[in-house]
Design a protein with these regions (language model features):
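Hydrophobic transmembrane alpha-helices of multi-pass small-molecule transporters
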Residues: 66-69, 181-185, 211-215, 287-290, ...
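N-terminal transmembrane alpha-helices
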Residues: 12-44, 48-49, 62-77, 81, ...
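Small-residue-rich hydrophobic transmembrane alpha-helices
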Residues: 54-114, 151-170, 277-339, 374-397
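Short runs within selected transmembrane alpha-helices of multi-pass transporters and secretion channels
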Residues: 75, 143-162, 170-178, 199-212, ...
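Small-residue hotspots at the loop-to-helix junctions and early N-terminal turns
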Residues: 51-62, 137, 141, 200, ...
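Helix-terminus/linker motif at the lipid-water interface of multi-pass membrane proteins
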Residues: 33, 37-55, 124-131, 187-196, ...
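Transmembrane helical elements of multi-pass membrane transporters/channels
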Residues: 23-42, 143, 154, 177, ...
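Short alpha-helical transmembrane segments in multi-pass integral membrane proteins
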Residues: 1-25, 82-147, 191-247, 303-370, ...
């Protein structure tokens, strides 16, 4: 394909599977790392300014993620459906689907950003913030929420290229954004002394630039899959497919993020320092699990194309390779990160407050020890996404947080009286249980049942 000249088009469907997994996953790891650096850069500079500013961002970030994850269901559906069309040899349908994804995602982003902007005071009040934390949270959210259309544009670009087996171009696109953000953060926050408003503005501008580039590249007619007026009218059949695959992902992701928001409220009960520690621990732990997330994403592409090509045995083999690579990596990385000396040294980069550092290091040590379960969770989720069974991942996403995590939190707080450590253990226990359930569902063979039919050949 013209948009993926660097890659052997037969690698995913007929080549070495381990090579296919790594060729897809490594650029996604780098890309995800760059995305995480957006938030870590803000965290680093805000940690230099004050604990209230840091706590404010940690408090409102889950709310922003709720909306972002709901819209991401559209682009996840796009990646799955485009990949299956490509596997089935239906390039014209793949082009049409890419344009339908663009219309849906961008429309959703603009409407939600406007509503969230208007509702910012109510959102911050509901979160229970007061004083300086509430003020900084309102300032940050009102600015950063407008990055949604730009973020979705980049996600559309990534979905289109990932479905074709090209994860390198999205990586370079985000590299430009993070490089820009590294300069803009200290400029707005320190030199211009804009604090949280500066952090939000820097992030907004750093996403606007790559989004503009993404739009220009997707409009190039020489690409096999591009944006074109010819396909810009909503098609009921394809809209139905997007909703069938994307809505469960959207509901699961946003419901899960709402749970994270309520978790933040539970942490905030223990004070501003605990809130800051919780945010730091989550972000650092997110770095160690990036390869697992990337391999899960690669699994969805490999499974999607092979299921479209009617090769379920190869799809399953790709999943198994992916899972073991992910689990082994996370087990080794987790063992290293769980050492107190290492975890303390890492979190000290983001805060000089001794109490914050102590709690964040403790949180990180507990999570790192059990992060290998994420390897099972992410790759098995990728399997179900690639086959279009997003209703399974939705159900597990929701129960992981709203059932297992909150029940564990209640038990540790009310029965065992573990204090803030109740939060730490509720995270690892709920992740472990959910990973086990997902694997059992895989063994039951649910993923083999046809959920979506793509292309003219399936009509």
């Amino acid at each position: 394909m013209k948009t993926a000249k660097k890659y052997n088009p037969d690698l995913i469907l007929h080549g070495n599977l381990i090579r296919a997994i790594l060729s897809l996953a490594i650029p996604v790891v780098i890309n995800s790392f760059l995305q995480t650096m957006y938030n870590l850069t803000d965290t680093y500079w805000l940690g230099k300014i004050g604990t209230e500013q840091l706590a404010a961002i940690n408090l409102v970030t889950p709310m922003q993620n709720i909306i972002t994850n709901f819209g991401s269901g559209i682009t996840v559906a796009g990646a799955v459906l485009i990949a299956q069309y490509i596997g089935a040899g239906e390039k014209e349908e793949a082009r049409s689907m890419a344009n339908q994804i663009f219309i849906c995602a961008m429309g959703f982003a603009v409407v939600c950003a406007a509503l969230c902007f208007l509702g910012t005071p109510a959102i911050v009040n509901w979160l229970g913030a007061d004083g300086g934390t509430a003020y900084y949270a309102r300032v940050y959210l009102r600015v950063v929420i407008w990055d949604m259309p730009f973020l979705y544009m980049v996600n559309i670009f990534s979905a289109v290229h990932q479905a074709q087996g090209d994860t390198v171009r999205p990586m370079f696109l985000n590299l430009g954004g993070i490089t820009l953000n590294l300069f803009l953060d200290p400029f707005f926050m320190i030199i211009l002394d804009m604090g949280t408003a500066g952090a939000a503005l820097a992030t907004l501008l750093a996403k606007a630039v790559p989004a503009t580039v993404a739009f220009i590249l997707l409009c190039r007619p020489e690409n096999d899959i591009c944006l074109n007026r010819r396909y810009m009218q909503l098609q009921r059949e394809k809209l139905g497919m997007i909703l069938k695959v994307g809505l469960p992902t959207a509901i699961g992701g946003s419901t899960m993020q709402l749970g994270f928001l309520l978790m933040s409220k539970n942490v905030f009960v223990y004070g501003t320092e605990a809130m800051a520690a919780y945010g730091i621990g989550n972000k650092v732990n997110g770095l160690i699990t990036l390869p697992s997330n990337a391999i899960g994403s690669a699994t969805a592409t490999i499974v999607g194309q092979n299921m479209g090509a009617k090769q379920p045995e190869r799809a399953e083999q790709g999943y198994r390779f992916s899972m073991w690579i992910s689990v082994v990596f996370l087990f080794i990385g987790g063992m290293i990160l769980s050492r107190d000396m290492i975890s303390t040294a890492i979190v000290s980069i983001f805060s000089k407050d001794a109490e914050v550092v102590g709690m964040a290091a403790d949180f990180l040590s507990v999570m790192a020890l059990w992060c290998f379960t994420n390897g099972v969770y992410n790759t098995t989720s990728g399997l179900f996404q690639g086959t279009g069974h997003t209703e399974v991942t939705m159900a597990i996403d929701v129960t992981r947080l709203w059932v297992f995590r909150f029940l564990t939190l209640w038990f540790c707080e009310s029965i065992l009286h573990m204090g803030v450590r109740s939060v730490w253990y509720s995270v690892v226990i709920s992740n472990g249980i959910s990973s086990l359930i997902l694997y059992v569902l895989y063994r039951c063979g649910i993923w083999k049942k046809t959920r979506i039919k793509v292309g003219k050949k399936a009509a």
